[in-house]
Curated annotation (Swiss-Prot):
PROSITE patterns: CLAUDIN (PS01346). Residues 210-211 are annotated as: Interactions with TJP1, TJP2, TJP3 and PATJ. Strongly expressed in liver and kidney. Expressed in heart, brain, spleen, lung and testis. Residues 29-81, 137-163 are extracellular. One of its GO terms (cellular component) is protein-containing complex. This is Claudin-1. Homopolymers interact with CLDN3, but not CLDN2, homopolymers. Can form homo- and heteropolymers with other claudin family members. Directly interacts with TJP1/ZO-1, TJP2/ZO-2 and TJP3/ZO-3. Interacts with MPDZ and PATJ. Interacts with OCLN, CLDN4, CLDN6 and CLDN9. Interacts with CD81. It is linked to Ichthyosis-sclerosing cholangitis neonatal syndrome: A rare autosomal recessive complex ichthyosis syndrome characterized by scalp hypotrichosis, scarring alopecia, mild diffuse ichthyosis, sclerosing cholangitis and leukocyte vacuolization. The chain crosses the membrane at residues 8-28, 82-102, 116-136, 164-184. GO terms for molecular function: identical protein binding; structural molecule activity; virus receptor activity. Residues 1-7, 103-115, 185-211 are cytoplasmic.
Length: 211
């Protein structure tokens, strides 16, 4: 019998991680402009995401420019885009598969073994989704660190981690944790041994010798 509480907890955590991945992908604050080395207070805040770059004025006005040319994008940005989209799509598949395998659902009630397998498969897909999101965010974050400490990068052209990047890391952690809980919610099979059957005792000898 599967642990319904553990299943539900794992599904909720993984689902929240999937929502976080969507939010992280859509947000434009993957990296924000670093003011290291500036001696003046600027009235602008610049930040970039996977799809656009924005400038926020102190008056509250925000101007964004969408990256319209795919060929002008760096390989890191293209790979991050692809991995985040793959992670989100895997999350969609995992949600449907895990929902079928949830003990609280009425699907596959007649086949308990198949129902547990669906829950484990959904958890495994959530693990793959979390891994894709984690690789994407770590790759992009590593690029920010390399450019920040690169002596060839001008001081006024350096960026730091943005809120969307932290959201992506949190989303990956939730997907991995939720997927692991779903995979562990089904108990291992116990080896059953056949019960010994009593054998009939041999008939007692009459004690007579026949010639």
């Amino acid at each position: 019998m599967a642990n319904a509480g553990l299943q539900l907890l794992g599904f909720i955590l993984a689902f929240l991680g999937w929502i976080g991945a969507i939010v992280s992908t859509a947000l434009p604050q993957w990296r924000i402009y670093s003011y290291a080395g500036d001696n003046i207070v600027t009235a602008q805040a610049m930040y970039e995401g996977l799809w656009m770059s924005c400038v926020s004025q102190s008056t509250g006005q925000i101007q964004c420019k969408v990256f319209d040319s795919l060929l002008n994008l760096s390989s890191t940005l293209q790979a991050t885009r692809a991995l985040m989209v793959v992670g989100i799509l895997l999350g969609v598949i995992a949600i449907f598969v895990a929902t079928v395998g949830m003990k609280c659902m009425k699907c596959l009630e007649d086949d308990e073994v198949q129902k547990m397998r669906m829950a484990v498969i959904g958890g495994a897909i959530f693990l793959l989704a979390g891994l894709a999101i984690l690789v994407a965010t770590a790759w992009y974050g590593n690029r920010i660190v390399q450019e920040f400490y690169d002596p060839m990068t001008p001081v006024n052209a350096r960026y730091e981690f943005g809120q969307a990047l932290f959201t992506g890391w949190a989303a990956a952690s939730l997907c991995l944790l939720g997927g692991a809980l779903l995979c562990c919610s089904c108990p291992r099979k116990t080896t059953s041994y056949p019960t010994p059957r009593p054998y009939p005792k041999p008939a007692p000898s009459s004690g007579k010798d026949y010639v």
